[in-house]
């Protein structure tokens, strides 16, 4: 199984470049799945619905988030509509979205993508438990 993970798309230029290149990357490396961390794709402040749709339509299979998950308030509802967007698994109960996604590949195999947020020089997932409410 070939998995391509694209780490931290930051801002418009990186996002637009990736969207253009994804089809070539997918065919060149004959990948089974492409996972992209897009928590900084909206100018370094989270992810928007529009950007998520663009990434998924370009060929990204699953999007992961991080500590900027709630910077764009529209994600509070959209993350419930789009299970291919994965927030931290270790957020407390009641936080919108899920921390994992089970993806069935074209050949019937399944892969589970899990996102866990740890901390180093930043707030813990526990102290940000109500960030989605502010």
Annotated model-derived regions:
Residues 1-134:
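Acidic, metal/ion-coordinating pockets
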């Amino acid at each position: 199984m070939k998995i391509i993970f694209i780490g931290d798309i930051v801002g418009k230029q990186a996002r637009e470049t990736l969207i253009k290149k994804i089809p070539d990357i997918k065919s060149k490396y004959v990948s089974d799945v492409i996972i992209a961390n897009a928590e900084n794709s909206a100018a370094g402040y989270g992810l928007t619905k529009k950007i998520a749709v663009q990434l998924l339509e370009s060929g990204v299979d699953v999007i992961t988030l991080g500590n900027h998950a709630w910077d764009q308030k529209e994600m509070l509802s959209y993350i419930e509509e789009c299970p291919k967007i994965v927030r931290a698994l270790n957020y407390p109960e009641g936080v919108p979205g899920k921390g994992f996604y089970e993806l069935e590949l074209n050949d019937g195999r399944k892969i589970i993508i899990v996102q866990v947020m740890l901390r180093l020089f930043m707030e813990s997932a526990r102290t940000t438990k109500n960030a989605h409410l502010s």
